[in-house]
Amino acid sequence: MISTKRHINTNELLHLSKAVVFGSGAFGTALAMVLSKKCREVCVWHIKEEEARLVNEKRENDLYLRGVQLASNIIFTSDVDEAYKGAELILFVIPTQFLRGFFQKSGGNLIAYAKARQVPVLVCTKGIERSTLKFPAQIVGEFFPSNLLSVLAGPSFAIEVATGVFTCVSVASADINVARRLQRIMTTGDRSFVCWATTDTVGCEVASAVKNVLAIGSGVANGLGMGLNARAALITRGLLEIRDLTAALGGDGSAIFGLAGFGDLQLTCSSELSRNFTVGKKLGKGLSLEEIQRTSKAVAEGVATAEPLVRLAQQLKVTMPLCQQIYEVVYKKKNPRAAIADLLSCGLQDEGLPPLFKKSAATPSKL
């Protein structure tokens, strides 16, 4: 068993000459702000040249993270080769549905560079690819060696990360020593951003994807005026759906009750800062998905994830009633109240939770 009782002191932290972030949305920009405390230079790749130039001039990414002044050592560029040249760490924060296309179109030299120099790759994207039903790290793993890959996940709203509000996340790799090295790189000296290492990459990716779908459901319940008790029930039962899918995909489940699992699920399902929660709330109030998307520039990843998630669950024969009903509300235009009624018509059931502790007849309960 891997011990989690490990403390990091400031002397253990690692600093780099340069890091590159591929993906310039709110979260990519926020992670660049974290890295600006650990690197001499941080380069952020943005797809449009003119927009990248304007960000550099204004020192603000007002498209996705308005009001946050960029650190002086952060540079935006639309040139892939310029972005990664000299980088000692590569982060991917490109939306899941566009990740493969990026590698196929622009990734050749980047991939060769990372392989030749053994540059660690941190996957920060969340979701499930529609065409293959793969998670982001699986997609990235088709192009980069597995020994370079880690996953970052956990409760981390971009605006708080970018402005140095205290945040804890998980860094996962199949090799705990790889995860611990990334932990030392990403944790900041002022402890405003702290990473915990784990080996449950599957659990981290499943939780990161499914929580966005569940957050839409939490928003729907809020829009219907269902209250906090309903939200707590959704979070609890939703966590079990994450558990069951993680088990079916071969994860060890250790991340489910950690930062990437319960932590991120609770946050995303409980705040108007969550784009997924906000989309769900508007659906609950009667707006159509088309109406919502016309007025929002930011991506609510749960919308893109719901459909492939349901197909993946069916393929693996995993029962996910909450995610199924959320999918039907989002894509089949099912009335949200009808979805709630269907969830509640399943009959009385046992809670279905295994005991955490073994109890023998010789040691009866003291309560």
Curated annotation (Swiss-Prot):
UniProt superkingdom: Eukaryota
UniProt cross-references to Pfam families, sorted A to Z: NAD_Gly3P_dh_C, NAD_Gly3P_dh_N
Residue positions of motif Microbody targeting signal: 365-367
EC numbers for this chain: 1.1.1.8
Database matches in PROSITE patterns: NAD_G3PDH
InterPro entries from the UniProt entry: 6-PGluconate_DH-like_C_sf, 6PGD_dom2, G3P_DH_NAD-dep, G3P_DH_NAD-dep_C, G3P_DH_NAD-dep_N, NAD(P)-bd_dom_sf
Residues the record lists as binding NAD(+): 23-28, 98, 158, 275, 297, 301
NAD is among the record's keywords: yes
Subcellular location: Glycosome
Active site feature: 211
GO MF, one example: NAD binding
Catalytic activity from the UniProt record: sn-glycerol 3-phosphate + NAD(+) = dihydroxyacetone phosphate + NADH + H(+)
Disulphide bridges: none
NCBIfam families, per the entry: PRK00094.1-2, PRK00094.1-4
Family: Belongs to the NAD-dependent glycerol-3-phosphate dehydrogenase family.
Subunit composition and interactions: Homodimer.
Listed name of the protein: Glycerol-3-phosphate dehydrogenase [NAD(+)], glycosomal
Organism from which the protein derives: Leishmania major
